[in-house]
Amino acid sequence: MSRLKKFYTEEIRKSLFEKFGYANKMQIPVLKKIVLSMGLAEAAKDKNLFQAHLEELTMISGQKPLVTKARNSIAGFKLREGQGIGAKVTLRGIRMYDFMDRFCNIVSPRIRDFRGFSNKGDGRGCYSVGLDDQQIFPEINLDRVKRTQGLNITWVTTAQTDDECTTLLELMGLRFKKAQ
């Protein structure tokens, strides 16, 4: 069992149950999945660069990414139907908890001028963060990076409100800005 999963079942569930006063234990929020995505429209013109970014996403997540393709052609953007324009990975289970542990303890402290993430969610129990640079991940070999590329991370939970979601993620180790 992952260190974070064990901590969730033994400690976090109890503190969430006490803080929010749920009627039963099935109402306690759970982290369902983590989705990592990259928009690679500029890299789509250069196949070697596109493959390099796919390899980086594979190293970051530990899974092979799904290439997202254009649904229709747009001549103004020189985009053809079926052309690869991005990549995404969905993490569940043990890989999800391992990624969350690495992100909170290793990656987020490496972000330059980091003072915490915004505590605004989507209102339905999901929380998203956009990173400007993939080089903050220790799995990435800095000598092989051809171009810096952003990365979007979305945490999907069973929480009903932003407060429940941010409290769950904060107890798991994600750092948020302090309310002033």
UniProtKB/Swiss-Prot annotation:
The keyword tRNA-binding applies. InterPro entries: Ribosomal_uL5, Ribosomal_uL5_bac-type, Ribosomal_uL5_C, Ribosomal_uL5_CS, Ribosomal_uL5_dom_sf, Ribosomal_uL5_N. Pfam families: Ribosomal_L5, Ribosomal_L5_C. Transmembrane segments: none annotated. One of its GO terms (molecular function) is structural constituent of ribosome. It comes from the Bacteria. GO terms for biological process: translation. GO terms for cellular component: ribonucleoprotein complex; ribosome. Keywords: Ribonucleoprotein, Ribosomal protein, RNA-binding, rRNA-binding, tRNA-binding. The keyword Repeat does not apply. Belongs to the universal ribosomal protein uL5 family. This is one of the proteins that bind and probably mediate the attachment of the 5S RNA into the large ribosomal subunit, where it forms part of the central protuberance. In the 70S ribosome it contacts protein S13 of the 30S subunit (bridge B1b), connecting the 2 subunits; this bridge is implicated in subunit movement. Contacts the P site tRNA; the 5S rRNA and some of its associated proteins might help stabilize positioning of ribosome-bound tRNAs. Part of the 50S ribosomal subunit; part of the 5S rRNA/L5/L18/L25 subcomplex. Contacts the 5S rRNA and the P site tRNA. Forms a bridge to the 30S subunit in the 70S ribosome. This is Large ribosomal subunit protein uL5. It comes from Chlamydia pneumoniae (Chlamydophila pneumoniae). The lineage of its organism: Bacteria, Pseudomonadati, Chlamydiota, Chlamydiia, Chlamydiales.
